[in-house]
Structures are given as structure tokens and as C-alpha cells.
Amino acid sequence: MYSQVLGYARRVLQQVHPESGSLFGFVPLYGSIAAGAPIEMLQIEEIHPVPNALLLRYPKAFYLRVKGESMNRILPNGCYALICPTSEVVDGSVYAVSVGSSNATVKRVRKLNNGIALEPDSNDPTYKSQVFDYGDGELETLSVIGRVVWFCVPYDYEI
């Protein structure tokens, strides 16, 4: 599915011409990503504006809608997180991560001596880190979709 997502992003971005003088280009929104328990990512073929400065810096980026409160200190529920596809992890940065074959979540990723921790960044103390240990074979079910590089709220977002 992720190859389809990234392939679609390339097709959409080929139609965008940042040098045209417009302040905004467009990137696809591929559905929701959990800020809580991992949920299935559903593909939604919509496009939404993004500042050209970001589009030039992250030409393969796409949006995922954040659903949940586990990252509410930095990503409000309902916002669009701009994801830059990558498989490399910078310790402590925020990533969209696939858990299993089609479930995904957005969390702060910490490298541990024995594995990886997916940490919430929430005002709600009931959200806890998920630790995946190298020895348990759990890391085989994790893959990085991309790093969160920016976010915006939809036009119809209610405060």
C-alpha cells in the first residue's frame, strides 16, 4: 500500500509547478493515522494545499489526518500532518510508523539499546510508550513511513 501512496504522490507532484509564482502547491491526503492505538490507514484521494517552500524541500511529501489525542501537545486531533517519506530515524523525532501490515500510528521514536520506543507527546498521562524489543521479533512488524515535517489544520477545523 505504501508504494501506491508514494507512487500517487509522485504523480500529483509532477502536476505542481512551484516556480509558477504561486505561494502554494498541492499534496495528497491519504487518510487518517492514529495518535493513540494504531489504526488501519485508508487511502483517500484528496489533495490539499501546502506552502511551496515545503513542497520544494520535501517533494515526495503527503498528508495524513491525525486522529486521536496521544500527540496533542504538538499535533492536534484532526490536523493534517505533512509526512516526508524516509526509512531513516533521527532519535526523538516524530514519525508515522506502520505497525503490522496496514495499521499506522504517529509517535516520537526513541532508539533504545534493545529496541525502539514509540512515545506519545500528550497532555493526557494515560498514554504510555510502546516498546518493541529486538529480541522479541517485534521490530519486524514495524516500518517507518516517514517523518512528520509540518502540520496544518483543515479549513473547517473547529477550536
Predicted regions and their residues:
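Short, positionally conserved secondary-structure boundary motifs
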Residues: 1-77, 138-142, 150-159
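Acidic/glycine-rich C-terminal interaction modules and beta/coil loop segments
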Residues: 54-159
